[in-house]
Every structure is written in C-alpha cells, then in structure tokens.
Amino acid sequence: VGDGSPRVDVAVLLRTFGAWIVPLIFTAPLFTQDIYSYLAQGAIVADGMDPYAAGPVELLGHEHPLARSVPFIWAESPSPYGPVALGISSVIAQLTGSSIFWGVVCHRMLSLLGVAAAAWAIVALARRCGVSPAAAVWLGVLNPLVVLHLIGGIHNEAIMMGFLPVSYTHL
C-alpha cells in the first residue's frame, strides 16, 4: 500500500483495543494498589470528613474494610488527590458503600470511559490537524501505558486523559 493510506483503519484498531481490555475488566488491579486508596478517600469524603486532615486509618478507623485495604505507605497519609478525583470517588463510595469489589468495578468503568473519550477526541483532533487518525489512536490509546496502567491499574489519570483531549476538540 504505497499510496499513503493507512494499512489499518481506526475501527480495526478500536476493536483490537476492545479485545485487549476485555480480559482486564475481569482482573484484580494490576501493578498497583492505588485503587484501594481511592476507595478509602472516597468513603472519607462521602462521610463528610476532610480527607486532607488525616489518613484513611485514622479517619475511617482500623476496622473499616476500605481503610484496611489501603497500602501501608498511604494508610496514615492525608489525601494527595484533588477535588475532582475525590468527588468522583465520593460518588462511587455513596453508590457502593464499603464493597471493595463494586468500588473497583465502578472505578474501572470510569477508567474505560475516560480512555474511550480520549480515543474519540484523538481521532477528531487527528483529522482536524491532518494527521493519520489510525496512527494517532495507535500512539495515544493502544499502548502499554494506557492498557496496563490506566485500565489494568485503574488510575485517576484515565479520567483526565478523557477530559483533556475532549476539551481541545471544543477550541
């Protein structure tokens, strides 16, 4: 294909991405335990406490299931997260209570939503800038950092990854 057209179109890449992430939807968080801190911080905010005043163990108590699941390094630390991340975690805590399983599922779905929004925006921005949408999706979405870290590891950055390029499409 020497005419400059992409060898693979965006739809094929997005189906590939879907095939890669389906197994991750059903796994425990990969490579990190940050999600457990997100859950505890969300419960703190949902309970009307100040997450910047103390750590999850002090605010929720040693016996709270979400406080017990926070990695030792963060158990006594005040929240490092900003108000948007805490607000999202608070809504999830209100929906899921102390259920670690359902909290993880909800956060992972939000990670997927953030990455899906980024994929849509990356295609739109690539077209606007005269760049191959397939190449942009390949570099921006179908890479190990996004697949394993943001979706597998369930990180707040996945939501930001969606907000940022979507906002650029409105400029």
Please identify what each model-predicted range represents.
Residues 1-2:
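Hydrophobic core of alpha-helical transmembrane segments in multi-pass integral membrane proteins
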Residues 7-12, 122-143:
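Transmembrane-helix signature of polytopic, membrane-embedded enzymes
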Residues 9-108, 112:
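Intramembrane catalytic core of multi-pass membrane enzymes that act on lipidic substrates
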Residues 20-21, 143-144, 164:
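Hydrophobic, membrane-inserted alpha-helices
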Residues 86, 90, 120-124, 165:
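Transmembrane alpha-helix boundary and packing residues in multipass membrane permease domains
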Residues 100-104, 108, 115, 138-161:
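Aromatic- and kink-enriched transmembrane "portal" helix at the membrane-lumen/periplasm boundary
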Residues 169-170:
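Conserved small/polar residues in nucleotide/adenosyl-binding loops
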